[in-house]
Amino acid sequence: MVKLANPLYTQWILEAIKKVKKQKQRPSEERICNAVSSSHGLDRKTVLEQLELSVKDGTILKVSNKGLNSYKDPDNPGRIALPKPRNHGKLDNKQSVDWNKLLKRAFEGLAESGGSTLKSIERFLKSQKDVSAACGGTAASGFHQQLRLAIKRAVGHGRLLKDGPLYRLNTKAANAEGKEGCESLSCLPPVSLLPHEKDKPVAEPIPICSFCLGTKEQNREKKPEDLISCADCGNSGHPSCLKFSPELTVRVRALRWQCIECKTCSSCRDQGKNADNMLFCDSCDRGFHMECCDPPLTRMPKGMWICQICRPRKKGRKLLQKKAAQIKRRYANPIGRPKNRLKKQSTVSKGPFSKVRTGPGRGRKRKITVSSQSASSSEEGYLERIDGLDFCRDSSAPLKFNKKTKGLIDGLTKFFTPSPDGRKARGEAVDYSELRIRKKGNRKSSTSHWPTDNQDGWESKQESEERLFGSQEIMTERDMELFRDIQEQALQKVGVTGPPDPQVRCPSVIEFGKYEIHTWYSSPYPQEYSRLPKLYLCEFCLKYMKSRTILQQHMKKCGWFHPPANEIYRKNNISVFEVDGNVSTIYCQNLCLLAKLFLDHKTLYYDVEPFLFYVLTQNDVKGCHLVGYFSKEKHCQQKYNVSCIMILPQYQRKGYGRFLIDFSYLLSKREGQAGSPEKPLSDLGRLSYMAYWKSVILECLYHQNDKQISIKKLSKLTGVCPQDITSTLHHLRMLDFRSDQFVIIRREKLIQDHMAKLQLNLRPVDVDPECLRWTPVIVSNSVVSEEEDEEADDGEKEEPQGQERELETRERVGKSVSRENKDQDSSSLIESEKKPEVKELASSSRLSKQALVRDSLPANSQPPRRGRCGRKNRKTQERFGDKDSKMLVGETLSTSQEQYGECEEKSAASRERYTEVGEQPAAPQAQADGNPDIPKGRFSESADLWRGQLKKSPETLKCRLPEGNDRLPCCYTDGDRAVFRGFSESSEEEEEPESPRSNSPPVLTKPTLKRKKPILHRRRRVRKRKHHNSSVVTETISETTEVLDEPFEDSDSERPMPRLEPTFEIEEEEEEEDENELFPRGYFHCLSSQDILRCQASSKRTASKDEEEEEEESDDADDTPVLKPVSLLRKCDVNSASLEPDTSTPMKKKKGWPKGKSRKPIHWKKRPGRKPGFKLNQDIIAVSTQECIVEPIVPIKPGRKPRTQESEELVEVKEGLVEERKEEMHTEADEEAEEEEDAASSDIRAMSPLDSSNSPDADPKEPEAEEEEEKPLDDPRQSEEEPQELEEQEQEEEDEVTAEANQNEDHDADDEDDGHLDSLKTKEPEGQPAREDGTEEPGTQESFLDASIQDSRENAKDKDETEADSEEEQPSHEASVGSETMPGSEEDHEEDSNTKEELIELKEEEEIPHSELDLETVQAVQSLTQEESSEHEGAYQDCEETLAACQTLQSYTHTDEDPQMSMVEDCHASEHNSPISSIPSHPSQSVRSVSSPSMPALESGYTQISPEQGSLSAPSMQNMETSPMMDVPSVSDHSQQVVDSGFSDLGSIESTTENYENPSSYDSTMGSSICGNNSSQSSCSYGGLSSSSSLTQNSCVVTQQMASMGNSCSMLQQNSVQPATNCNIKSPQTCVVERPPSNQQPPPPPPPPPPPQQPQPQPQQQAAPQPPPPQPQQQPPPPPQQQPQPPPPPQQQPPLSQCSMNNSFTAAPMIMEIPESGGTGNISIYERIPGDFGAGSYSQPSATFSLAKLQQLTNTIMDPHAMPYSHSPAVTSYATSVSLSNTGLAQLAPSHPLAGTPQAQATMTPPPNLAPTTMNLTSPLLQCNMSATNIGIPHTQRLQGQMPVKGHISIRSKSAPLPSATAHQQQLYGRSPPAVAMQAGPRALAVQRGMNMGVNLMPTPAYNVNSMNMNTLNAMNSYRMTQPMMNSSYHSNPAYMNQTAQYPMQMQMGMMGSQAYTQQPMQPNPHGNMMYTGPSHHSYMNAAGVPKQSLNGPYMRR
């Protein structure tokens, strides 16, 4: 007997199955058992048993799938939820069940007036016998489902109306739909044309239906039908296609119908406005905006809608219906239907109509969907229900049409879109006409219902509707009222009270705390909230809710009573909380949504992670009530301190807005930078901020009674950025232009009136800095203007010189202001302000500072120590400052701990001062700000900002307090040093470059004297580096001033960060500050002229170049007495000159690189003739140059002095800059180590150059011209003074350095790759940068360039020679000398013809230090000198023509490139300066792998890159200009340059990035094999390469190389030729090219350090020192390069030297060369490789240097592959790349030389060694230039646009065009091809400019990756550089760029060793330009002994 399942249990199981399936789960045995047991308590065993039995008897279905059993209800299987199974049961029997009849019966039987629910209908039907009989068999669920389906269908067809959960028969639908529609339409008044429609013309009708494409003969159904045509566009459609009812059609034909595309609102007649919110009348098809309706609608009405024109006038029930409709709309209309808002009448007569007339499908495609569809079931039911009568009819008709026509309408909408405008109109139009016609017809047909009279008709219509309704359910007035009341109550519970807002603000009201606030704007709350009229917000957590009930429930649970963050400020009942968008994301999002309700333009709501929100609250016992907030980006490159600010309406006009603005500036001041609100400001924001700025400035002026006050000082005191101060002063009419100066006019009445008002009406809430407890997240943003940093530096520098300078400063300030004014109003203002500030600083600061100095507080009174100790000290201090922030007390040096501690503190204070100055982004301000700013700022503003900061600085406070609390706190606020660095990047970092030196143990050991000497040395280095760095860093600095400053300072600091000798940092800082304080003028004599020049330069720049020059002369005069030795004086002079150009340019610095300006330091351009041989002078010049960056100091070229001058120039550009630059000048003169820091400082200076170059870009052009005129005057004196100063410095330094020499050599070469090698590099690159500066700004200061170049060259030559000799004598000096030589070289090239005398002088001077220098160095210097002389004589002469052409280009290339170069040089010099850096660079090479000294910069970050690699540093700095953080290309356009720069310099940038990843491996490899090789090519491989023992050799080699490279490195040497001068004008590369003489000179001496290869060409030298180990790798290629170069050096010395400089060969020396000239340019190229200098520069050195290095790199990379890019090889690569960068410069120069043919040919000589490479490079060079798109682009543009490529290549381009004014790039290429074919120069150029190296470097987006890659890449790039030139074109090509990007790692890792890769790049090469020959590249690589792939791959990647 079969056991049957218990039917009860079976039913339970089926219910369980249904329940489980309802939960979207699989009905498994387990789940069924659980469900049954939970509901019926049946045990599992029984359930399973019954389940099995049920399966057997078929009542349950068992499904097995994948081993799992599921159970289903056969009657109700899953997805087929239709009456299938049930049909089997009850409905199946009753297949004939007519659900329509059943439903009708149910509704009639229930007779519920409001409608019946589904449940009641189901209950009613189940109670009917026939139904129960029919459906009894099936489960209840089956019947329920069928019923639901039937009701749904009925609703869809319009038979039923759905109102919420209620259903009701549509009485209208009961009649024929057409009839009812007609009825509703017919009840409407007849349609008539409106007045404005009568006169309008009617378009010619198009006789084709736009929908079915039929004619009037046949429509879609092939029947004849007349068309309706649009009166505006003539498009036609069949009424049936438009879904018009006959009635509507009739009405529409009587009107002027518009299609949906042309439809305009009949009310406002604005066609373009808000088409989406347009409703189409169902009677006339006119369009109306919802807000234009009467009454306005907030939601799309459902059902039929009739416009106010057609609508009958309502009488008796008018009000009721209106309200009901409103409720209906509010409640019933779907939220999503904004368009058709139901109007009360519309509901009544329209609901049905719209369905009838096919409302949904009518012609209004867009609108109809809304309106017709809106008339769909749910809404319609609701609306109609409210209207009563309308409901039934409306629903049914519209519903019908809705479904079918919805798609149609959409389709039609698309169809009817002849014109974009007409689209909506047309659809709408169609609708209207149909409606009208329909209505007419309807009206007639249903006349019985509706009277003709509008009013009567309406009433009767309503009545009839009611009657219709009434047949089933009589709706009485009472029913309606009841319904309304209940509905309103329900709505109230949901929180909706008032009528919808016509303005469609969602929400229109919010309840927030105890306030109900009407919103001003809509906010993107989620849709379900945004449509609500009112939102309820929790005032503590800002959660938004729909109703008060929900809010009350939430408030019981919400435990918040303050924002979810730390309270950073509290005073009385006011608190500020700092909320991190990354931590409290929801809160911040809710805050943004709330803010948007009261802000017009706000786009940030959900992406809050990158922002900090400072929430202002008012506190009471209940909690902290939100008052307002402002948000700021965490890492804002533009230094915006507010991105959004909002005060809730209830707290407005109570001073809270001003409080928040003030608070934001307080935070900025604590960060040590000036801030500015995010631009553009809204109208309200502009008003608020202008009011704030006015009051702050007036109050500041009221409290500052100094006769002189600068914008910079104002900026420092207020935290307001100089641009805003300038615009405000201009607005207050307190800025005037008088006698070539911008002067701040104290309008005492205005000030007094303001203060009187203020006293009468005290501010209700004021920010009390004492109540702030906050530490900046980032000490200093890299965004801080370089100008600011420089200004800060200058401010400090100026302080010491105080009185001396006061007058000059004032004049300068005026000038500076004028120049700055050109830069920007703020800049000008700053200058003016600076005058008083300088004075004040001079007096008050000076007094207190000097006292402090005497108390061994040099930092603050940096001027006193400026001489030699000062700068160095300052650097030390600054570095220490960096450390200071990290370990201010801990790192006091053991040697002079107390002294240094004080110094450190002082430096911290001074740094803070600088920071403060930096904070005031105005360039001039920085100058004046220096000291005066600090006193004033300290006392007034410092009270607020600095107090807090002072608290932060423990030790610093001690000494800084006396100096100025402002500054100290600033420093600390900024993370003390970091901020400082960041802020006064130019100033501090310029000083910082000394830090490496300072850091070097020797300097530390000799606190005062040594400090002085090393400081001088550092100074030189600084200059070199500054020069170099300036070019590179300048660009970076503008955008990433803070970061740059930090990293570069860190570079130096971090170079010592490994902190070889924290003391040195302290020492440097101390000394610098001592310089300021202890040696107000005595020491200033060295730096004084620079500093003064800086001050003057800033002022002069601002005012005018003439004035600047005069003031510079004054400075010189001032300095001259102060200057100790002639060389020192010359240094200062040159610095002054340099500074002047810089000064003019620095103003731009703030903004970033000017478009047209070169990124090189201006002085680069200025000292084109400088020979690398004059390293000492060049060192000084480098400092000058870098300082001079703004001021193209061709004359400054004499040595690094231009760097100092550059610093000064920068200073002149900004008063603050002047001060900063002065420090720089001192620092630079003081220490090449500072030049290391100048990698950082270079950043700063570069910033200065940026400021100078950038500012000058626009601003300096006039002032620069003036400068040019005056400069020559000043320059000679400067040159003379500088060389003397340099000589003395060098001798002193050499004394010290000789002691330090070994250390320094190792350290500098290693640690400071930027040290010695870098120094050489720096010199050369910096010289180049200087030269390029000169070149860069030639346009602006062409005359100046020429005259100045000559003077500068003479001075630079003397200095360069002195420096070179000095360098040779001491490795450390050597580095610095090399660096200086580089600048000299550049300057020489540029100044060659002008400065041959100078060269001779410099040579002589060089000889003086020569005895002290190493033999190698001596040889190198000699060779450099010879080369320089020969080049000057031949190449430079040759280049003179080019120079003329170049100068034109120079004006705009100069600025851009000069600053970069300058910066790079700064970096190099600084790196060179630090003996410790040098040595420790091996261990710390990881950090500063390529340029160990630079590496600290690397450690620092980008800065590290620059400083670490003296030479690399320059390029690094160049990149740094872009991005102080070398790894942060994004920081600035130049960030690419940063990478490039770093890479170029010594692979340091790569090393830097790589160092980040694998510093040790990078360093060690670089240090040992690459270092050895790179020693000579140190310029490129300085940091990491020559980091190790080869450093000394490196130093020598570098010195030689540097000397040689001084002229653009080996390559640049060739380039160094006069064409290079042109190049100088064009770009750092150009400058580098000008260095060729130096390069060529060194080639003979270089051989001593390196093998013959190196002697031949500097490139080889570079490669040679390294080649010893990797020489086979590198040497073969370098020999080709260098061998060709030797010939070119001689050859090129005259011809190639300037432009071609043996670009191909230059590639080998490119390390040095690049660092100095290529360094900035090329490093820039590398860092800004994409379009700047990376490719070109890199290309060539890549070939030589890269070959050796590349081989090593290949070995390392192939082997140490595991290392993060095998830093060593990477370094090699980098070094090579750097070399290449220089080479690129050289090559670029050759392009130019090509223009000036001799060089090109000279370059062609190198082909023997470089032949394939050279040729390749040449072609690629050309290609690169072309591919770089730099060819036709203006240099500045190119530079800016292609940053990476632009810097160098662009510069080169400029160079190239010099000879031929054609597109620089193109010319370069064009010219280059002949010479380039053989010469690496052109190739390098090609690579550099068009080189995708830059691009690839950049494309390898991550700096680190690039860096790492870059190392390899650089190694490869070393190759690649040359190859890159070839590659450059291919790189330019997108495909190749990709390759470069994709290869970098690959190449570095495996490909490096594999030739396949090389060939691959060759293959891509075609992509770039055919010129690049893969094979050539290949051979090049082979020559190098490095895998071609290495070169090719990396390069190609680039």
UniProtKB/Swiss-Prot annotation:
Residues 72-93, 336-377, 440-464, 783-947, 982-1079, 1096-1175, 1195-1436, 1450-1567, 1630-1702 are annotated as: Disordered. The N-terminus is involved in transcriptional activation while the C-terminus is involved in transcriptional repression. Residues 1639-1658, 1665-1693 have a biased composition (Pro residues). The gene is Kat6a. Residues 144-662, 1510-1735 are annotated as: Interaction with PML. Residues 1907-1942 are annotated as: Required for activation of RUNX1-2. Residues 1030-1041, 1472-1496, 1527-1541 have a biased composition (Low complexity). InterPro entries: Acyl_CoA_acyltransferase, HAT_MYST-type, Histone_H1/H5_H15, MYST_HAT, SAMD1-like_WH, WH-like_DNA-bd_sf, WH_DNA-bd_sf, Zf-MYST. Its EC number is 2.3.1.48. Residues 444-457, 1135-1146, 1501-1522, 1549-1567 have a biased composition (Polar residues). The lineage of its organism: Eukaryota, Metazoa, Chordata, Craniata, Vertebrata. Histone acetyltransferase that acetylates lysine residues in histone H3 and histone H4 (in vitro). Component of the MOZ/MORF complex which has a histone H3 acetyltransferase activity. May act as a transcriptional coactivator for RUNX1 and RUNX2. Acetylates p53/TP53 at 'Lys-120' and 'Lys-382' and controls its transcriptional activity via association with PML. The modification Phosphotyrosine is found at residue 900. Residues 95-171 form the H15 domain. A zinc finger (C2HC MYST-type) spans 535-560. This is Histone acetyltransferase KAT6A. Residues 798-840, 875-886, 903-916, 1203-1228, 1316-1333, 1351-1360, 1392-1413 have a biased composition (Basic and acidic residues).
